[in-house]
């Protein structure tokens, strides 16, 4: 008699695809408080699949013609319209670059932001911090 298994309760990304969990991070917010900005009372965590080869992080703007793949327009006022870029290299490694953002791009709680135009290699579990409170955690397949 064949063994039957129940389908997964949550849809999973296709094999080999990285995902990113986007969340409001109170600890990051408190360390980098921006005057006049309050932590959101109701912030929804979400997970997205990273479409290769590039994923732009920022805030949508029709007047500026920006439409990032990770759009934080409705959630984090500290995120620039063109904030950061995730790029899948030819050898299968994800990289992050700051695009000259106003408030910087930070990795794994480091005190110094990634310089504008500088690139760093990422691995599963790394956290990219942007804006006033957003933390993007990368998950390897």
PLM regions: where:
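Intrinsically disordered, low-complexity acidic Ser/Thr-rich regulatory segments
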Residues: 1-77, 134-141
